[in-house]
């Protein structure tokens, strides 16, 4: 892992350079001075999606969901708890496909919920269907580790 990481602020979407050893719960954005780590998933829209996927040095796990989807609503608390467990190693984010159908179309989302793991803009893996917190954590760690071994 790089000694300096790029980490996108979940509030103002400014890219911050942070020493890997300093990426803790107390790291703040250099622009808006709010915490970089939220302990929960961040909401992405069409404007913030690319910036968060392309500029993060860390993997980003995106939950493509919709408010009318029962399994999506059922999985939401598990996804939020998984975010608290996986941060700062994997950033968790959510995209409302009803509000942002262009993102669902661009990434060929055919069923929801669908989890897609990205690293520096490249899709590493995807899973369709609701998962428990432990399954989300296990799956994302396994896919992230598999991708890092393939890259080395």
Q: For the regions a protein language model found, what residue spans apply to each?
A:
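Short pre-active-site segment immediately N-terminal to redox-active cysteine/selenocysteine motifs
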Residues: 57, 64-68, 111
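Thiol-based oxidoreductase modules, predominantly thioredoxin-like and allied folds used
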Residues: 64, 75, 79-83, 87-102, ...
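Cys/His-rich microdomains that often coordinate metals
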Residues: 16, 36, 76
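Short cysteine-rich clusters marking metal-coordination/redox-active sites
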Residues: 9-12, 29-32
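A short beta-strand-turn-helix
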Residues: 41-60
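Non-catalytic, surface beta->alpha helical segment in thiol-disulfide oxidoreductase systems
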Residues: 111, 116-150
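Short Cys/His-rich micro-motifs in 6-15 aa windows
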Residues: 32-41
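Short linker/helix segments within small regulatory modules
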Residues: 18-27
């Amino acid at each position: 892992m790089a000694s300096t990481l790029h980490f996108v602020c979940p509030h103002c979407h400014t890219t911050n350079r942070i020493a890997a050893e300093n990426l803790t719960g107390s790291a703040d954005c250099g622009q808006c001075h709010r915490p970089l780590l939220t302990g929960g998933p961040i909401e992405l829209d069409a404007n913030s999606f690319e910036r968060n996927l392309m500029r993060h040095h860390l993997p980003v796990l995106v939950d493509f969901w919709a408010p009318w989807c029962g399994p999506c609503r059922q999985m939401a608390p598990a996804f939020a708890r998984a975010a608290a467990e996986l941060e700062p190693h994997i950033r968790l984010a959510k995209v409302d496909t009803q509000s942002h159908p262009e993102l669902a179309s661009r990434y060929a989302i055919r069923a929801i919920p669908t989890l897609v793991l990205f690293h520096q803009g490249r899709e590493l893996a995807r899973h369709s269907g609701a998962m428990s917190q432990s399954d989300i954590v296990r799956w994302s760690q396994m896919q992230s580790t598999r991708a890092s071994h393939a890259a080395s």
